[in-house]
Amino acid sequence: MNKVYSVEDFPLDEKTMMLHETLFHNANGYIGVRGTLEEGVPQEYNTMRGTYVNGFYDVIPMKQAESLCNLVEEKETMVNVADVQTMHLSFDGETFSLFSGEITNLIRTLDMEAGTTTRSMQWSSPHGHEVQIQFCRMASFTHKSVFTIACKVTSLNFDGELTVSSKHSGIVANYANPSDPRLAAEGRAYLRPQANILENGVSYLVTHTTKSNLELCTAVAHRFSKPGSSLVTYNADAHCYETSYTCRLHPGETLLIEKYTVIQDSIRSDNCLQDAQKEIESVYGKLDALYQQQREYLSEFWKCANMEIDEDDESNLAIAFNMYQLLQSCGSDGKCGIAAKGLSGEGYEGHYFWDTDIYILPFFVLTNPALARGLLNFRYSTLDAARENAKLVGHQRGALFPWRTIHGKECSGYFPSGTAQYHITGDIAYAAVKYYLATGDTEYLIKEGAEILIETARLWCDVGNWYDGKFMINDVTGPDEYTCIVNNNYYTNACAKYNLNWAVKAANILRKMDAFHALADKLALRDEELDEFQRAADAMYLPYNEKLGINPQDDSFRIRRASCRERV
């Protein structure tokens, strides 16, 4: 099945360029780099030039109309960590740009078997210099901290001096668009310079977040295929290194520029600089080996994930594209999840929602259980924060997972369509059960899964109430965010019923493995509480209209008779 998506001779308008920045981004679940042009765009163009690390964040104020008890007053936001893309090419003083001279054979390609994006074109400069240029990018799946750019310049008729100017900037601003609620964060830099080092031609920039107290190190190294003069300079004001390289290029000759970037952060590393040094040394000059490893990794992925619809190439390519985006977005180390926009940009500020657990995780459960386990490990790592979140909104027991988060705290500033969506707690419990049923991973159930099920079941018992022999859940918001704060949302109640039933089942499974007492001691869990879970599950009210034979969305749902008038 074809797994190459490409566009040719596309318009160079702002809307198309922004779309392509997303479609042709590179990511591996840890780092993500938007598909902006290495050489940049005209100043009047809107662009989102960004590099992101999954789970790396800063903390900023959350503005509220009024200050009320336990309203969210600050939030976590994903940080644009560096600019390692910028690369300018100059031919006898004429700087390459898609917006000057004449461009032909312009193609952008995403190869989902090679794990690379390419952009190639033939450029005729205003003075008639003709060159073939290709950029190839890769975020390595086998070396998660590594991002590479390979630029190949072939002279068609140019005979002169080629100058390359490549930047490594550690202070960059986040993007903001006040008219778009998905991008309403502040457009400012969240990193501060901490150190800069130039060692054996490799530039290292160490930065620090302003409030979350996280550290990041980026390392950049270049390799040129032709002899030439090279100089690396540092601009302290911009916390930026610039590598300048010059060589002679004759017709028929090709220059290959390899740019290696390594990113390390203090969430995963105890010494970011040292680990960046080790990794850049291990991969430098080994681009072909990295390409081969990337192909081998994706070959294994497609063996498990591949599916085809007979005689429908367009749908097959669309399915492959979406599967590949899931893979690019998926955190695998238990320290991060899957952001609403993946690592393609700053939409929703890099927050994790219920999408991960109810829509995406089941795909990995069936195709790559190890990745699914990593996502569940991350949710477990935030369980204590979920317990605290439950207390903040007034519950006596249990765990309430946040509607949107990065590190575990609630980052939704609007309660009715945010925190009130209690179903996310049931979604996470559902994901834990589906993983266990598909894999039979009892170790997960013992170490993490059962604890999540018990704590979330406790929440439902605290949230719900008994009325006329039925267990009901009031004042919550279901997946329909246009109908906020309702009683007995069908989806929420069904999730809670499933959650409560499985809390009891998990406890019984652990009894058979002699693992129950350790969990019971840890959680102060008694058989009477398990009986309470079962009673609530058995009596859970699921709205049903007997006359129409349907399940209303919630107690406030109204079915209106359609009114049709004959038109002449």
Predicted features, each with a name:
Residues 55-57, 172-180, 345-350, 381-389, ...:
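Short, mixed-charge aromatic SLiMs
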Residues 125-128, 156-158, 329-333, 366-374, ...:
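Secondary-structure transition/capping motifs at alpha-helix termini
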Residues 136, 150-152, 165-169, 246, ...:
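Short, well-ordered alpha-helical packing segments
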Residues 290-437:
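Substrate-binding groove/exosite segments of carbohydrate-active enzymes
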Residues 344-352, 399-447, 455-542:
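The feature captures the catalytic groove of carbohydrate-active enzymes
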Residues 558-568:
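Residue-level detector of conserved catalytic or cofactor/ligand-binding positions
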